[in-house]
From Swiss-Prot:
InterPro entries: FIB_ANG-like, Fibrinogen-like_C, Fibrinogen_a/b/g_C_1, Fibrinogen_a/b/g_C_dom, Fibrinogen_a/b/g_coil_dom, Fibrinogen_CS. Residues 170-416 form the Fibrinogen C-terminal domain. It comes from Rattus norvegicus (Rat). The keyword Nucleotidyltransferase does not apply. Disulfide bonds join 179-208, 352-365. This is Fibrinogen gamma chain. Gene3D superfamilies: 1.20.5.50, Gamma Fibrinogen, chain A, domain 1, Gamma-fibrinogen Carboxyl Terminal Fragment, domain 2.
Amino acid sequence: MNWSLQLRSFILCWALLLLSPTGLAQYTATRDNCCILDERFGSYCPTTCGISDFLNSYQTDVDTDLQTLENILQRAENRTTEAKELIKAIQVYYNPDQPPKPGMIEGATQKSKKMVEEILKYEALLLTHESSIRYLQDIYTSNKQKITNLKQKVAQLEAQCQEPCKDSVRIHDTTGKDCQDIANKGAKESGLYFIRPLKATQQFLVYCEIDGSGNGWTVLQKRLDGSVDFKKNWIQYKEGFGHLSPTGTTEFWLGNEKIHLISMQSTIPYALRIQLKDWSGRTSTADYAMFRVGPESDKYRLTYAYFIGGDAGDAFDGYDFGDDPSDKFFTSHNGMHFSTWDNDNDKFEGNCAEQDGSGWWMNKCHAGHLNGVYYQGGTYSKSSTPNGYDNGIIWATWKTRWYSMKETTMKIIPFNRLSIGDGQQHHMGGSKQVSVEHEVDVEYP
């Protein structure tokens, strides 16, 4: 008989003893001790039935407590059984009277070490995988955000495509034969305008630089950031390349044919201004009188009357680099034909335009070269060029031939407007005349 059954039997016997006549016989009922009303017995004195009712009211709680005790005893019995089974298992594998087998402890120790090593290895592997998972999660989150941004951009573009096409570049309505003509007609804002020189068959777009004094400069060339490659062929230099912008903040070459049509159209000669900026932000200019570019039949020959002035110096007149006594003569530009890599018209036995990677009025080869290779930072060297020649954006009378300009501008204006509100004082009497050996006088129909 288990303990739960013994306990239940004990409690039942005790209850029967209370209910038996023997137990009740010891109780002598008197009025003093019996007829005292007690809510536990109802409205009756504690007769046998009253006590029975009283005990019955507690029977449910007693049964519950008994069941709880039985459950506890059952769990204890189960644990005891499990402990006995475990002891039996230990006794099977361990006999205190039997000495351990040779190497048993060492083998168990080695197995334990190996297990520990395996556990550590898997822990390290898990850490590595966790790190990789976090990295991939970061990439996923980043890509998800990028995809969201791209979807938004696509939605914006789709919405934009639903609208009628609009020209986002502002082109002014005023037209004329050059930018000064446009300024004379009342234009006061720099920007893009259409002009039609006298002998042009159709109008074309130019950038006009108009100042507060009413001067209208027609811009022929701009270098700003190296965004445009100036290594172009003859046709590209003829027609022009790059980008014209309303703010004048893009690189371009207007085109030799357009420059020819503008510069040759008027009885009033044009002045050419060259503006330079180095990588320290310093600026300088060089002005030339009676600037003209001939027709294609004459290889777009450059001519001018004389150097007016400017702190950049007269590089168009050549420069003595000290390499040869004839340096100055063979690096002058007045009267030179235009050359490109595929149309060589220079005085050099080789091809200046090809070795310098540009198009320009080459002699043998140059002292001023504004269409050269754009070198970030300005300074470059012979070893950094493909052929060992100075091929940067140079102006030898202001900087060395191994210093490439940061920004350049070539622009023209009618000569009689040059000194009006310009801020630069050029005196004709002090102007430097071109020497006889460089002077060129060419008539074009």
